[in-house]
């Protein structure tokens, strides 16, 4: 059906994609798409906006599908009309032919994918060429033809031909063939394609005239033997016609008498000449041919064949004992028997089945000095000339017991010594390999593998462009205020100045979803009218009470106090209204971090679909950033309690910020906090005192920082892989620690071990850790950071304004952006495990330091260093 242009939006075509029923009719109870299918024709280059409406589902994750594939457009917005009514928009700012196809919405509900009916988008424009004139070569005045074809829509398409600057023939419906009777000089041809939208011009093709080839170049002769030679050449200009053969003329020199003429099919441009005489001078020249004729011959190239190798063998070998060596004699080859120009003889002697040496002599006698008279001696001789060595003589054996006199010539026996040595070597090798594999298996069993495999799903980073903001308040909605959510007065006071009205931002696609909530990309409208890309963290609609809201917003209140480049800063909080007197949905607005969490980024670098190198200098920078942020937090008397790579975020400039303060606490008195019951804790990052007595201090954050350093060095491996949560405390109290990764510097691992000291007060402060890491990185500064491979082609944003908020995370060409972003998204799996706190004490703040009993118990945690296997603390 035709789409009329709106008077209010003359250049914006709105398509209502309203699907009345899902394809299979299996609609979940109460959930439905509304509307009907539609067919749209639009001109190329025009903007188009598609929308679909879904009712009966809270917080759906809608996807746009085109021809069966998920649409990766950056211009997608999802707007809640009310609690269970959502509208999704897909904007195409300048449609191309490739945008033509079938579009529909898809949502997953209860494990089933439900789809709306389809919309057909047809993009019309000037004709598009499918066949264009090609460059060809033709014989003079010979007939030939040219082809041209183009398609719409719209149809029909008419073809007009041009020869040089003149039109040829009459317009013809595509596809068109132009028949040319012949030309005698190079000529250019092109075609035009016309339809009601306009015309397109094809490429200009050049038709050349064929000619005879030019002579070959660089003729060389190689691999010369006594009877053969290899000739290689480079073809000259082929006359714009393929060469089909080359002719070689071989002649004896100096009289130039032709010996043979050889025709070689080409390519390859090489030929082996056979049947030549030995020790003879020859010359060769080459010409090549195409359908138009043959080139002139090249200049002659001269070469000489080699001599024949000797064919006779020395006879009657005998040896005479002399002190200190042996004199060997044999019958020489008569000069009138051979014409191979004998140069001498080669003698070879063997002991213990190994050639001990050889010598070349001019006459028929040789003096042997370097041999062992206590072992059997085998001798053989051949005739030698410039072509090589002739056949070997019969083997002559001189046994050890006959050294002092006699001599005989028994057959050449076989020794079993090499066989026995070979078998022994194979057995030793097999045993060594078995021991290596066994040792490796034991290590894997004890510590496990960090990961089996991580398969990137190819999901792209989430991008969108918000065309406008929407007021979602209706007559049924109760205004969402801090007074309406049932939180404490203290928390209301803290959040009052950072409360943002929900009309000020527009939600985009979902970035991630967890057990208790989700994170969406959004555009926040600022006071000056500009827009800022942010991330919105919200609780799920069906799992929270006033207590849940208060705990969720306490994290925001905690972040409000932070102002440091390496600590995530709160932008604001907001409340989404809901009907029927239900509690509003709390939302925390945070800066948008382009590269996501650090753990996912590290995994992507190691086992993503397109792994990339993270130099040690870059890894050290990550550690320094985290240490700097934690130094700031500790100076503010904050303990994090959940420091890990997964809770650190990476921005577009590769700077790390400490984030996720859901477990953080401020210490108003004393230096420690005692955890109450019913809190979930990341066991493998906890310090010994935290596991034993639920005590949390800045020193316990230092322990977690050591584990985070280990995560960074291993590029995201799981700490204590293969060890259950319930076993961690006994594992640590026994003196065990994480092992030194293979590529970890000694200085860096020493810092980790200091972070894991059993006595909390003997662990370094974050200021000391930052300083030490900066010193280590400074010693590596010989390699300029500008040469750091990590910074090659990252963030290839062509536009950074709100008009095109596309995000690219590329480590290669632009085609790899979505693949790498998808691999990072696939890597965010929160693969660590939690257990409940072992003690159920009151969740309060104690204004005292460790009692003596606790200090004594902590001191009892001291252990002796283990030295077996890999290096450990």
Swiss-Prot record:
Residues 215-308, 310-403 form the Fibronectin type-III domain. CDD domains: FN3 (cd00063), IgI_2_Axl_Tyro3_like (cd05749), PTKc_Tyro3 (cd05074). Its main location: membrane. Keywords: ATP-binding, Cell adhesion, Cell membrane, Disulfide bond, Glycoprotein, Immunoglobulin domain, Kinase, Membrane, Nucleotide-binding, Phosphoprotein, Receptor, Repeat, Signal, Transferase, Transmembrane, Transmembrane helix, Tyrosine-protein kinase. Residues 29-116, 127-208 form the Ig-like C2-type domain. Residues 29-416 are extracellular. One of its GO terms (cellular component) is plasma membrane. The active site is at residue 642. The modification Phosphotyrosine is found at residue 673. GO terms for biological process: cell adhesion; cell migration; cell surface receptor protein tyrosine kinase signaling pathway; nervous system development; phagocytosis. PANTHER family: TYROSINE-PROTEIN KINASE RECEPTOR, TYROSINE-PROTEIN KINASE RECEPTOR TYRO3. The gene is TYRO3. Glycans are attached at residues 51, 179, 184, 218, 228, 281, 353, 367. This is Tyrosine-protein kinase receptor TYRO3. ATP binds at residues 511-519, 537. Residues 438-873 are cytoplasmic. It is a single-pass type I membrane protein.
């Amino acid at each position: 059906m035709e789409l009329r242009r709106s008077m209010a939006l003359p250049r914006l075509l709105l398509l209502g994609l309203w699907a009345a029923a899902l394809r299979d009719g299996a609609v979940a109870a109460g959930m439905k798409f509304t509307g009907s299918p539609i067919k749209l024709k639009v001109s190329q280059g025009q903007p188009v906006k598609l929308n679909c409406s879904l009712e009966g589902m809270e917080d759906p994750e809608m996807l746009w599908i085109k021809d069966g594939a998920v649409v990766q457009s950056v211009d997608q917005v999802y707007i809640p009309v009310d609690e269970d009514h959502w509208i999704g928009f897909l904007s195409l700012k300048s449609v191309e032919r490739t945008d033509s196809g079938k579009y529909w919405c898809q949502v997953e509900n209860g494990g089933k994918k439900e789809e709306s009916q389809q919309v057909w988008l047809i993009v019309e424009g000037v004709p598009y060429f499918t066949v264009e004139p090609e460059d060809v070569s033709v014989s003079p005045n010979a007939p030939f033809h040219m082809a041209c074809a183009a398609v719409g829509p719209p149809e029909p398409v008419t073809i007009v031909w041009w020869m040089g600057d003149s039109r040829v023939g009459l317009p013809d419906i595509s596809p068109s063939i132009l028949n040319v009777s012949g030309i005698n000089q190079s000529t250019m041809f092109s075609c035009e394609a016309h339809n009601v939208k306009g015309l397109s011009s094809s490429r200009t093709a050049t038709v050349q005239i064929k000619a005879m080839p030019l002579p070959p170049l660089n003729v060389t002769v190689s691999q010369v033997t006594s009877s053969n030679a290899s000739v290689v050449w480079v073809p000259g200009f082929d006359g714009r016609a393929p060469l089909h053969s080359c002719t070689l003329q071989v002649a004896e020199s100096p009289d130039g008498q032709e010996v043979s003429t050889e025709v070689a099919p080409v390519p390859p441009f090489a030929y082996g000449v056979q049947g030549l005489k030995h020790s003879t001078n020859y010359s060769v020249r080459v010409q090549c041919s195409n359908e138009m004729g043959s080139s002139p011959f090249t200049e002659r190239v001269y070469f000489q064949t080699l001599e024949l190798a000797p064919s006779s063998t020395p006879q009657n070998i005998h040896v005479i004992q002399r002190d200190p060596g042996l004199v060997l004699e044999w019958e020489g080859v008569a000069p009138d028997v051979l014409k191979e120009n004998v140069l001498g003889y080669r003698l070879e002697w063997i002991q213990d089945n190994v050639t001990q040496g050889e010598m070349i002599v001019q006459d028929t006698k040789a003096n042997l000095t370097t041999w062992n008279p206590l072992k059997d001696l085998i001798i053989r001789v051949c005739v030698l000339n410039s072509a090589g060595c002739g056949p070997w003589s019969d083997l002559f054996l001189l046994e050890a017991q006959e050294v002092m006199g006699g001599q005989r010539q028994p057959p050449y026996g076989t020794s079993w010594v090499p066989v026995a040595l070979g078998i022994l070597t194979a057995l030793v090798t097999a045993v060594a390999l078995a021991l290596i594999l066994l040792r490796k298996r034991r290590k894997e069993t004890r510590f496990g593998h960090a990961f089996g495999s991580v398969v990137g799903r190819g999901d792209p980073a989430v991008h969108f462009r918000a065309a406008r903001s929407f007021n979602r308040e209706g007559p049924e909605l109760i205004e969402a205020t801090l007074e309406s959510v049932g939180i404490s007065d203290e928390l209301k006071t803290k959040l009052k100045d950072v409360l943002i009205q929900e009309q000020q931002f527009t939600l985009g696609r979902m970035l991630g979803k967890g057990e208790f909530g989700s994170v969406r990309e959004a555009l926040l409208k600022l006071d000056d009218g500009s827009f800022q890309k942010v991330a919105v963290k919200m609780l799920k609609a069906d799992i929270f009470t006033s207590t849940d809201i208060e705990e969720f917003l306490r994290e925001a209140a905690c972040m409000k106090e932070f102002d440091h480049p390496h600590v995530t800063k709160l932008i604001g909080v907001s409340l989404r209204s809901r009907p029927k007197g239900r509690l509003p949905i709390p939302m925390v607005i945070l800066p948008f971090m382009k590269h996501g969490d650090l753990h996912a980024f590290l995994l992507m670098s190691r086992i993503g679909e397109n792994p990339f190198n993270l130099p040690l200098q870059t890894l050290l920078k990550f550690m320094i950033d985290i240490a700097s942020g934690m130094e700031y937090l500790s100076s503010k008397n904050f303990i994090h309690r959940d420091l890990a790579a997964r809770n650190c975020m990476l921005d577009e400039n590769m700077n790390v910020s400490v984030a996720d303060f859901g477990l953080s606490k401020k210490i108003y008195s004393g230096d420690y906090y005692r955890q109450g019951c019913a809190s979930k804790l990341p066991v493998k990052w906890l310090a010994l005192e935290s596991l034993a007595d639920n005590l949390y201090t800045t020193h316990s954050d230092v322990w977690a920082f050591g584990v985070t350093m280990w995560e960074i060095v291993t590029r995201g491996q799981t700490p204590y892989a293969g060890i259950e949560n319930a076993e961690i405390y006994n594992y640590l109290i026994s003196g065990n620690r994480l092992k030194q990764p293979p590529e970890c510097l000694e200085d860096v691992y020493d810092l980790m071990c200091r972070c894991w000291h059993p006595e909390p007060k003997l662990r370094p402060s974050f200021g000391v850790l930052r300083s030490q890491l900066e010193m280590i990185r400074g010693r590596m500064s010989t390699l300029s950071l500008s040469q750091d491979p990590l910074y090659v082609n990252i963030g290839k944003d062509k536009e950074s304004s709100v008009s095109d908020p596309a995000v690219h995370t590329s480590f290669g060409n632009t085609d790899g952006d979505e693949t790498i972003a998808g691999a990072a998204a696939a890597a965010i799996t929160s693969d660590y495990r939690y257990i409940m706190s072992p003690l159920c004490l009151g969740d309060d703040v104690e204004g005292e330091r460790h009692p003596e009993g606790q200090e004594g118990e902590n001191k009892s945690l001291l252990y002796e260093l283990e030295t077996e296997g890999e290096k450990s603390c």
